[in-house]
């Protein structure tokens, strides 16, 4: 799959809220039963949230969800609000590496989960140069992909490019499609934060000098070939590993 297929305008919320399925639904004949089946099936498939807490994962899904999950995951039912609090504590303290909390209304569960955190939106890129190398940054001893907070009033897609430019000193970025969205939590000054990060496909020239943004704790910026890329993956965050496993990203990187 060529990188050019990923370059062009893309609407973040279309993927986040599941609107990409509209193309599929539109192909079905106009009989009410067929349309109802398509919409119902798509809703069932989409009803799932995956949140990374430290090195563990909490999955929120409906009882109807048909998405596959790790067989080693612990499964619990969401009956009342205290179930969410207990699930968060269990995952956060490392008692369970993967916990699935399932209930009748996944959106209600999601709102309950979010009530325990301050939500911050961020954006970044999976950046590939003309040599098919991937851009990585080293921050606090861990390899990461360049990203940063979306400023007030700023468009997510613009923030993604700006953050990559600032953190790595690269120029001439071509922003493409949204590759995925990740959720992870952390603490800042005793406040629990939930970060929602939008990841875009990006390309740029390899003929430029990289410079880490030291004030942001970044000590190294590299273009990684396949061997170096795999080395970075072995020392990165679980949310990044999960992002790179997504089919759309795998096709984009061609590794």
Q: Model regions: which residues?
A:
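Aromatic (phenylalanine/tyrosine) cluster motif
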Residues: 6, 10, 24, 36-37, ...
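An acidic, glycine-rich, mixed-charge low-complexity segment common to nucleic-acid enzymes
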Residues: 42-84, 88-90, 97-101
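Nudix hydrolase/Nudix homology domain
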Residues: 44-45, 51, 62-63, 69-73, ...
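Conserved Nudix-box catalytic region and its N-terminal flanking loop in Nudix hydrolases
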Residues: 68-78, 128-165, 170
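Acidic, metal-coordinating catalytic segment for phosphate/diphosphate chemistry
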Residues: 81-124
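Unchanged
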Residues: 150-237
């Amino acid at each position: 799959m060529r990188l050019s297929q990923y370059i062009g305008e893309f609407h973040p919320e279309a993927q986040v809220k599941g609107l990409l399925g509209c193309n599929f639904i539109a192909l079905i004949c106009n009989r009410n039963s067929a349309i109802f089946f398509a919409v119902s099936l798509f809703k069932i498939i989409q009803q799932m949230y995956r949140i990374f807490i430290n090195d563990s994962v909490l999955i929120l899904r409906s009882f109807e969800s048909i998405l596959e999950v790790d067989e080693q995951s612990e499964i619990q039912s969401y009956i009342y609000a205290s179930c969410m609090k207990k699930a968060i504590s269990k995952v956060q303290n490392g008692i369970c590496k993967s916990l699935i909390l399932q209930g009748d209304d996944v959106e209600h569960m999601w709102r309950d989960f979010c009530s325990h955190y301050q939500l911050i939106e961020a954006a970044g890129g999976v950046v590939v140069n003309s040599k098919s190398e991937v851009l990585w940054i080293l921050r606090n001893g861990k390899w990461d992909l360049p990203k940063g907070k979306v400023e007030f009033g700023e468009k997510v897609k613009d923030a993604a490019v700006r953050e990559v430019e600032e953190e790595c000193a690269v120029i001439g970025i071509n922003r493409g499609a949204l590759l995925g969205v990740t959720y992870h939590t952390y603490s800042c000054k005793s406040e629990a934060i939930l970060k929602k990060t939008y990841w875009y496909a990006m390309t740029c020239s390899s003929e430029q000098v990289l410079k880490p943004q030291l004030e942001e704790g970044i000590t190294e910026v590299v273009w990684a070939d396949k061997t170096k890329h795999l080395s970075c993956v072995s020392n990165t965050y679980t949310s990044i590993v999960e992002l790179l496993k997504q089919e759309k990203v795998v096709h984009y990187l061609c590794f």
